[in-house]
Amino acid sequence: MKDLLNLFNQQRQTLDFDAIKIALASPDLIRSWSYGEVKKPETINYRTFKPERDGLFCAAIFGPIKDYECLCGKYKRMKHRGVVCEKCGTEVTLAKVRRERMGHIDLASPVAHIWFLKSLPSRIGLMLDMTLRDIERVLYFEAYVVTEPGLTPLERRQLLTEEQYLTARQEYNDDFDAAMGAEAVYELLRTIDLQSEMTRLREEIASTGSETKLKRLTKRIKLIEAFLESGNRPEWMVMTVLPVLPPDLRPLVPLDGGRFATSDLNDLYRRVINRNNRLRRLLELNAPDIIVRNEKRMLQESVDALLDNGRRGRAITGTNKRPLKSLADMIKGKQGRFRQNLLGKRVDYSGRSVITVGPYLKLHQCGLPKKMALELFKPFVFAKLQRRGLATTIKAAKKLVEREEAEVWDILEEVIREHPVLLNRAPTLHRLGIQAFEPVLIEGKAIQLHPLVCTAFNADFDGDQMAVHVPLSLEAQLEARALMMSTNNILSPANGEPIIVPSQDVVLGLYYMSRALENKKGEGMVFANTSEVKRAYDNRVVELHAKVKVRITQVDVDAVDGKRTSGTSIVDTTVGRALLSEILPEGLPFQLANTEMTKKNISRLINSSYRLLGLKDTVVFADKLMYTGYAYATRAGVSIGIDDMLIPDEKKGILTEAEAEVLEIQEQYQSGLVTAGERYNKVVDIWSRTSERIAKAMMDTIGTEKVENAKGETIDQKSMNSLYIMADSGARGSQAQIRQLAGMRGLMARPDGSIIETPIKANFREGLNVQEYFNSTHGARKGLADTALKTANSGYLTRRLVDVAQDVVITEIDCGTTEGLIMTPIVEGGDVVEPLKERVLGRVVAEDVYLPGNDEEPIVTRNTLLDEAWVAKLEDASVQSVKVRSTISCESSFGVCARCYGRDLARGHQVNIGEAVGVIAAQSIGEPGTQLTMRTFHIGGAASRAAAVDNITVKTTGSVKFNNLKSVAHASGSLVAVSRSGELSVLDGHGRERERYKLPYGATITAKDGDAVKAGQSVANWDPHNHPIVSEVAGFIRFIDFVDGVTVIEKTDELTGLASREITDPKRRGAHAKELRPIVRIVDGKGNDLTIPNTDLPAQYLLPPRSIVNLQDGAAVGVGDVVAKIPQEASKTRDITGGLPRVADLFEARKPKDPAILAERSGIISFGKDTKGKQRLIIKDTDGSEHEELIPKYRQIIVFEGEHVTKGETVVDGEPSPQDILRLLGVEPLAAYLVKEIQDVYRLQGVKINDKHIEVITRQMLRKVEIVDQGNSKFLNGEQVERQRVIEENARLVKRNELPAKYDPVLLGITKASLATESFISAASFQETTRVLTEAAVRGTRDNLRGLKENVIVGRLIPAGTGLAYHAGRRKASGLTDSEMETLSGKPAGAEPVAALADAGADEE
């Protein structure tokens, strides 16, 4: 008995560790693991099935095959435990030791370990400072290498060919040593003196000037440092002893018919042993050199194949031409150890079945088939049967259960009571894909699911299956009930809105009962209360949709102290809404329900209920809503028939008009007035506009009907057309779908995304002809192919996101930072896309917020969590911007703090310590991935129409405000914009921004700053098709380098007869004219150059190719006049990457193809001399220093000579690269850019994601910094280090009054960031396993197991949520002090143990 207890204690000890270290194994270490040498390649005897002695399965080395029984059978049973049989050499013990006992092979010749040789960068190569090519020549016996030059002029590590070697031998006899093969490499590595090599390199670094040399030296220093710190020796990268894996991990199983199924490793080991033995024999026989060398080479190859098959040369294949699976293949990839067995395991106590609807269930319940429940809860049932005395033994209980006696079911009922089960639907894209329910036993074989949780699971009932899991332990049940119960997950963690929202039938029923119709039976009646209404309705005195007056009792709940006050009032409503008011919980205002219950309104209702009344009432209310919805959907009996698809009468006329327009454009094209591209764009435009018009006409036809009201007048009212009801309520279908049924099908896309210019004019009711049908299948198939690709891509994005953010956990309440992001409302083209209140809701304020124009009394103080009430206050005070805390600026050393994160979106209060916000962020961004599109949009058609805006018409009455605008006053009295980034906003009476517009260069602005404007007034206009060049001074024009027929071509407009000049493309000019640069200069009356105001630059404008000048030489120009214009169709063909690929590009921080070029500093623009293919752009700083930039000719420079730019402003058009934004503008603008761009993609698809989630990922992308100046730190210049490491090291240096290191932030893509994490276990299980493990082993890296993934892999509770407390408790119990704990958790110690100890000593004195 005591032994058993000891056994348990032993197991406990192995679980209690705080870090895992990986390092190179020395030959002695390998021998110490081993239980004996494997000398023979034999496996098991095919007749007796017993392992051969000294073979790969030898019982003497690896342990017995049967528990407590030696191989020859002399010793059997427990009593001989620990005896070693003298006959067969087997130790009598448990057979499972065959899973852990290793053997070894003594290699007759050293062998280079392929990982350290071939895994780039080659570690052996770096160590020896030789190229991989050279080392391989030595290893594979093609060249000699000098290992010890002695007194000869030869150099150490010099390669010699066979001839050179022989010559050298004759010349110097035995004064030098040279060798080939792994022995030579081993010798070279063994004789390296790391310490002196290190000193030499540091000196060399100080003296070298070449960039490439520096890189190589830094790499070598880092490698040698790693060897010194980890205690590894370089020669261990060449193996002299090979460990042999325990046999049960590479099993050999006899199949019937005398064949064997075996692990590939056995084949690989056999090869190694065979060659090793042969080599040993050859060496004993003193065989000729050439044979021995060949054998050594073969040994090297076979060991390579065993470790990593296919890394070098062709992979060794087995009998069936399939490459053998080597040790490296076992751990990497989706089928490898990490991802197949450690991160995802099969789970017992689980079952799966088809799901069906359970409309009568409560929200916390699910229907579990009796058969399933019995199987899942079997042990519990057995135990209870025994306890009740219904069965004496387990076996008897089993019999009872198998017979399914009546009492078994009663006991099952008891066992299941209040024992929650987990339901999971694959794919589990976010945490709501697994929820807990209380099971209700049902007949049948399908699991019943509550309809309201379908949205969260993304489930429907067309054959979906779900898995059931039983939480066994008490803690597990508790967590399931408290955290995972469906009733505790009403809000979505992605955006904080209710996810338990009725859909489809329920919405239809609620919408139907809450519609108001004219002149229905009982209109105008007055009722004393809702029960009276119910009575009247049940007795058919009133109809459901009749407008009536009802006295309704309202209960108001005070938000602060929860006091309830009630009052009654008579309300105009309908019978249906009055009935609906009966199910409203007390305290929810009736006006919320006194509308048409569309899906949006129902969602708003549930949201208000949750915020006002809390969880419990809301859950009960949601259930009642569902029951009511189903009941009335049944009564409504809504069905659709072909006659519901009403085709508008106007359709014919609209189509005729469009056809005429298209014909006209076709004629223009044939007479050469428009280009093919313009014609296509215009045609597509016309059709998309027509399609819209028909859709509108159709919605009017379907959506309204004429009725008589009570007074006998005919009026329009919303129709009760079944199709319209469904779309309007949000139950099913949308305007776009109805348009295809009853309007026109519209334009179709080709598989490459371009639009077919002939639209489908018919709709589905009229039917398509053959050509139309063919055109429509074309795009539809693409859709199906897209969906399949999309799922895979989206899943991969989610995996990368989870991996990069998995270790972000809330670790403290407040990090104390004062930094944050400044939030303003998002305004685009006159619409407030996202008001300030939505952006700051649930955030913590970083700085006190004052009323605009009042700095005395703050409205909100720092560190306030903004909830709905606070946000409303800000809105009333019309605050424009708030600085809020953000995870990006959080200063916690590990994880983030609760204040910087703000509100836990799924719970509605400040986030708890231990919440795994990183994983939540990754899931929230990844989950909607499948809804995003896959294609890249070509700008054309609808998109370009939106782009051709040519004026600003304000939508609200208020005042005009210019931001960032430079303008000149035109003679006509209006202003002309001469800056690119200018914006015009409209403020309302409170000074709140309502609209914001971009003002393009050259726009004529008819309003002044601060002017009052009325809604509908036009305040600016411009020519959308031409980019003007505006004169900033008044004077006369002088043409320079205008050579007719060479640099300019004169054209005369056929219609107007006016002459204009077009600048030619320099590529098309002759060699002599390449240098000519057409310039328009502005001079005064005497011909002297004028300068641009506030600068000393001449007023001259360099004209790009294809620009058109309408003025004549010597013509007078005024301020703000157009000197030349550049036609703008060229830049319109840029593709926009949309949807999923765009999100992936942003998170991977990829540089766009032709990135925008940003100004490296602030200053004045001028152009230098052009080179062959590039233009030279110069920015002159205020202090006179210059910055030059060479820009390819084909790029569009959007700044002009003499213009002032600020650092980070765009000077060349294009998509900005995130790295540039970070470098020139800093972290906050980068964060803002990433959030905006990613949100734009999701917003287009109507997906709401909170900014926080994107910020959490951005924080992880900014984990690393690059050292610019090492100071006195241990880092090297150009090294990338975790930001936290540098901050800690700097703090230490400052304490000692030494120079701290300087650094710049680095932006890594999510894949790179995941691989660069501190934890090698997490990185290895993600991608590039070999590279990560090689690197970690050389460094002797220790993994402190701080992230979630590492802990899952080693099989412990994760340090998040309830696991956080467990880990804290475990550390307390192990009796470690705080400082020791810090060391373990990876604070500064560990990397420099000696220094740390010296420090500690110094401090104590």
From Swiss-Prot:
Write out the GO biological process terms. Answer: DNA-templated transcription
Q: What's its EC? A: 2.7.7.6
Alphabetized SUPFAM superfamilies for the sequence: beta and beta-prime subunits of DNA dependent RNA-polymerase
Please name the GO terms that the record assigns under molecular function. Answer: DNA binding; DNA-directed RNA polymerase activity; magnesium ion binding; zinc ion binding
Bound how, and how many: what does the cofactor note say?
Answer: Binds 1 Mg(2+) ion per subunit. Binds 2 Zn(2+) ions per subunit.
Region Disordered: list its residue ranges: 1375-1405
Q: For binding Mg(2+), which residues are annotated in this chain's numbering?
A: 460, 462, 464
Q: Name one GO cellular component term.
A: DNA-directed RNA polymerase complex
Under catalytic activity, the entry for this protein gives: RNA(n) + a ribonucleoside 5'-triphosphate = RNA(n+1) + diphosphate
**What InterPro entries does the entry give?**
DNA-dir_RpoC_beta_prime, DNA-dir_RpoC_beta_prime_bact, RNA_pol_asu, RNA_pol_N, RNA_pol_Rpb1_1, RNA_pol_Rpb1_3, RNA_pol_Rpb1_3_sf, RNA_pol_Rpb1_4
Q: What class of enzyme is it?
A: transferase
Q: Where does Zn(2+) 1 bind?
A: 70, 72, 85, 88
Presence of the UniProt keyword Nucleotide-binding in the record: no
- Enumerate the Gene3D superfamilies for this protein: 1.10.132.30, 1.10.150.390, 1.10.1790.20, 1.10.40.90, 2.40.40.20, 2.40.50.100, RNA polymerase II, clamp domain (4.10.860.120), RNA polymerase Rpb1, domain 3 (1.10.274.100)
The answer, when asked if Ribosomal protein is one of the entry's keywords, is: no
* Swiss-Prot/TrEMBL keywords: DNA-directed RNA polymerase, Magnesium, Metal-binding, Nucleotidyltransferase, Transcription, Transferase, Zinc
- What cofactor is this protein dependent on? Mg(2+); Zn(2+)
Where is Zn(2+) 2 bound in this sequence? Answer: 815, 890, 897, 900
Q: Which family does it belong to?
A: Belongs to the RNA polymerase beta' chain family.
Identify the HAMAP family for this entry.
RNApol_bact_RpoC (MF_01322)
Its job: DNA-dependent RNA polymerase catalyzes the transcription of DNA into RNA using the four ribonucleoside triphosphates as substrates.
Q: Which PANTHER family match?
A: DNA-DIRECTED RNA POLYMERASE, DNA-DIRECTED RNA POLYMERASE SUBUNIT BETA
Its quaternary structure? The RNAP catalytic core consists of 2 alpha, 1 beta, 1 beta' and 1 omega subunit. When a sigma factor is associated with the core the holoenzyme is formed, which can initiate transcription.
Protein's recorded name = DNA-directed RNA polymerase subunit beta'
